[in-house]
UniProtKB/Swiss-Prot annotation:
Involved in the breakdown of propeptides of storage proteins in protein-storage vacuoles. It comes from the Eukaryota. Residues 1-24 form the signal peptide. This is Aspartic proteinase. Keywords: Aspartyl protease, Disulfide bond, Glycoprotein, Hydrolase, Protease, Signal, Vacuole, Zymogen. It comes from Cucurbita pepo. One of its GO terms (cellular component) is vacuole.
Length: 513
């Protein structure tokens, strides 16, 4: 949008905040780092203002996605590309150097590098963010190797350095980090953070840098190789939450945690079962899905077919896809007949010549073409879009046939879903007055059902008559064998206290207190 930069510059006047971060090491051997929560309002809801070029960056990253990763193997450009940190709500404070220089950072379980702005960076953003000054630190050590990280809203580039990093009362010696000489984008100037501290695995660290958390464990600074997140979703309370390094705080959760093993070392990734809408299975994850617990992602991201079904159930307004309706009108009856004749669902779209493969690609790999305004500019893009819509139609029809719906009802339902197709990485609006009638959305993890109520997955922006309600669900498509993939961000982690067990390579979830 033409006025985007001017909007960003204008918004920065409203978004300067001070952080009173509390951190402590108690006599139970746990390190607690308090988090500050930023309340969503129309001025700081930046996710909806991300320029279309950022969506193109995401699409490019998805095309490069490494589908062959196994435990211990991953790609630097994977889930990190999803991130739009500008609408993140939770931040904490660290310090770098001797004497300590303070920085506000996002603690991000979905990436693994530590970066802050370099003193050598000169831009408008520098006036609103702390910068690391190596010349003022007696513990600084030069490295100089160049580094670059691609995010959803741009790239951070700079060079590696070494210095002591203070997290709470603990000091990590000679920690490698990136001094950023290029910030993510112009919109970074209105962000509430100065940098990012990754809590993922070294396998996805740019430059194979040793993460801060690894050094905490290696240097014997924590009681156990475990850390946990408690995010306070109570909008009336200022306290944002707490990260506990070295264990868990029983006051942060109720009952027992359900643990699942890490299946893809790199991210905190695990296997997940089906997704339910008001108790009814969607069927999409019957064959299994993967999920990543990601504190650096504000929303809850998942495959477009399921997100569209959720949007329909909650009345969210997305992007109307005429291409979707065209496929339903021309091929809907044929697809249904093939399903009723027990044809292989994975091969139906190739049988009717909408896909050029026989089920090996997987649903939604080319979904960016479905809603891309430029999809019609080339026959290849158009064909990919038709193929993706066909794949989604098969999934939706399978779900409806399981419920013994009539043919007419199924076709009408699929057309309604076409009207609810979300924008790539975009958010969808809902009627704030309809929250009480919206369904529960549930996730199956470790054989247990984890429910999200409407007030937990709908984000309210603003107050009174000007209040807006935004769906906490957004579309994100990764093909097999790595996908289908869900990103369980702050919407999920706010409802469920999350334990990241580095020693036993597992993730645990329990009801947050």
């Amino acid at each position: 949008m033409a006025s985007y930069h001017s909007k960003a510059a204008f918004l920065c006047l409203f978004l300067l905040v001070s952080f009173n971060i509390v951190s402590s090491a108690s006599n139970d051997g746990l390190l607690r780092v308090g988090l500050k929560k930023i309340k969503l309002d129309p001025e700081n809801r930046l996710a909806a203002r991300v320029e279309s070029k950022d969506a193109e960056i995401l699409k490019a990253a998805f095309r490069k996605y490494n589908p062959k990763g196994n435990l211990g193997e991953s790609s630097d450009t994977d889930i990190v590309a999803l991130k739009n940190y500008l609408d993140a709500q939770y931040y904490g404070e660290i310090a770098i150097g001797t004497p300590p220089q303070k920085f506000t950072v996002i603690f991000d379980t979905g990436s693994s590098n530590l970066w802050v702005l370099c003193e050598c960076l000169f831009s408008v953003a520098c006036h609103f963010h702390a910068r690391y000054k190596s010349s003022r630190s007696s513990s600084y050590k030069k490295n100089g190797t160049s580094a670059s990280i691609r995010y959803g809203t741009g790239a951070v580039s700079g060079f590696f350095s070494y210095d002591n990093v203070k997290v709470g009362d603990l000091v990590v010696k000679e920690q490698v980090f990136i001094e950023a000489t290029r910030e993510p984008s112009l919109t970074f100037l209105v962000a509430k953070f100065d940098g990012l501290l990754g809590l993922g695995f070294q396998e996805i660290a740019v430059g194979n840098a040793v993460p801060v958390w690894y050094n905490m464990v290696e240097q014997g600074l924590v009681k156990e190789p475990v850390f946990s997140f408690w995010l306070n979703r109570n909008v009336e309370e200022e306290e944002g939450g707490e990260i506990v390094f070295g264990g868990v705080d029983p006051k942060h959760y109720r009952g027992k945690h359900t643990y699942v093993p890490v299946t893809q070392k790199g991210y905190w990734q695990f296997d997940m079962g089906d997704v339910l809408i008001d108790g009814e299975p969607t069927g999409f994850c019957d064959g299994g899905c993967s999920a990543i617990a990601d504190s650096g992602t504000s929303l809850l991201a998942g495959p477009t077919p399921v997100i569209t079904m959720i949007n329909h159930a909650i009345g969210a307004k997305g992007v109307v896809s005429q291409q979707c309706k065209a496929v339903v009108a021309q091929y809907g009856q044929t697809i249904m007949d093939l399903l009723l004749s027990e044809a292989d669902p994975k091969k139906i779209c190739s049988q009717i010549n909408l896909c050029t493969f026989d089920g090996t690609r997987g649903v939604s790999m080319g979904i960016e073409s479905v809603v891309d305004e430029n999809a019609g500019k080339s026959s290849d893009s158009l064909h990919d879009g038709m193929c993706s819509v066909c794949e989604m139609t098969v999934v939706w029809m399978q779900n409806q046939l399981r419920q013994n719906q009539t043919k007419e009802r199924i076709i009408n339902y699929i057309n309604e879903l076409c009207d609810r197709m979300p924008s790539p990485m975009g958010q969808s609006a809902v009627d704030c007055g309809q929250l009480s009638s919206m369904p529960t959305v549930s996730f199956t993890i470790g054989g247990k059902i984890f429910d999200l109520a409407p007030e937990e997955y709908i984000l309210k922006v603003g107050e009174g008559p000007v209040a807006q309600c935004i769906s906490g669900f957004t579309a994100f498509d990764i093909p097999p064998p790595r996908g289908p993939l869900w990103i369980l961000g702050d919407v999920f982690m706010g409802r469920y206290h999350t334990v990241f067990d580095f020693g036993k390579l597992r993730v645990g979830s329990a009801e947050a207190a």
